[in-house]
């Protein structure tokens, strides 16, 4: 998992409440067991005017020019600004995969659905909670400033805007450690690889019959 220490990026404002995981990545794209290939279909039903299907050439599909992600000014955005209850709906981990693969490093919102919130941390995507007044201020700045960027400093737990305004945010200490060091569940387990090896060797000595070949 890619570490998250400090990130400066273009902000894309998604001014909708209760964005659910089926809107983030529609159900027809969930057949793959791989963690890649979902970015091109992020917000598929909003980005395109036709019904998307797996394996389509998206470059030939009609674009919804009224959807914010298709605005030229937000191309290359890596910070998604959202509203309350982002990521509600089903528990699909693909939603975090799609956002990450598209290029978003963080989603800033007043609140998140619990399962999406947890899935994001496990996949290197920072779900960052600011209060409604602070989020409203960021939306206002996005509207009046083309090319609006901000910096998220995870170590300092601060959002730093273009004019130098800072917003502090809270994050669980363990989750912060994992993001700073790029540790997913596998990475955390591998930190204890030597202890696991020692345990398995001792286990084989204590209970050798468990490892005897079957006849």
Curated annotation (Swiss-Prot):
Gene Ontology terms, MF aspect: 3-isopropylmalate dehydratase activity
GO CC terms, sorted: 3-isopropylmalate dehydratase complex
GO biological process, one term: L-leucine biosynthetic process
Catalytic reaction(s) noted: (2R,3S)-3-isopropylmalate = (2S)-2-isopropylmalate
Gene3D superfamilies: Aconitase, domain 4
Keywords from the named record: Amino-acid biosynthesis, Branched-chain amino acid biosynthesis, Leucine biosynthesis, Lyase
Any one Pfam family match given in the protein's UniProt record, by short name: Aconitase_C
The protein's Enzyme Commission number: 4.2.1.33
Covalent S-S links between cysteines: none
Similarity comment: Belongs to the LeuD family. LeuD type 1 subfamily.
Complexes and interactors: Heterodimer of LeuC and LeuD.
Protein known as: 3-isopropylmalate dehydratase small subunit
Species this chain originates from: Xylella fastidiosa (strain 9a5c)
């Amino acid at each position: 998992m890619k570490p998250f220490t400090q990130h400066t990026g273009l902000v894309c404002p998604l001014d909708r409440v209760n964005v659910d995981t089926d809107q983030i990545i529609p159900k027809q794209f969930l057949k793959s067991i791989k963690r890649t290939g979902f970015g091109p279909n992020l917000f598929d039903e909003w980005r395109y005017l036709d019904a998307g299907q797996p394996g389509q050439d998206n470059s030939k599909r009609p674009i919804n020019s009224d959807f914010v992600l298709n605005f030229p000014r937000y191309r290359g955005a890596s910070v998604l600004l959202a509203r309350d209850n982002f990521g509600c709906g089903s528990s699909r981990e693909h939603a975090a995969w799609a956002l990450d693969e598209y290029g978003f490093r963080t989603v800033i919102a007043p609140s998140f659905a619990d399962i999406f919130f947890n899935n994001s941390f496990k996949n290197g995507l920072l779900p960052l909670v600011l209060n409604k007044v602070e989020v409203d201020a960021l939306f206002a700045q996005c509207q009046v400033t083309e090319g609006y960027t901000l910096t998220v400093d995870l170590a300092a737990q601060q959002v730093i805007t273009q004019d130098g305004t800072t917003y502090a945010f809270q994050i669980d200490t363990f989750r912060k450690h994992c993001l700073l060091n790029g540790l997913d569940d596998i990475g955390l387990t591998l930190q204890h690889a030597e202890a696991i090896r020692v345990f398995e060797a001792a286990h084989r000595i204590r209970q050798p019959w468990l490892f005897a070949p079957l006849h």
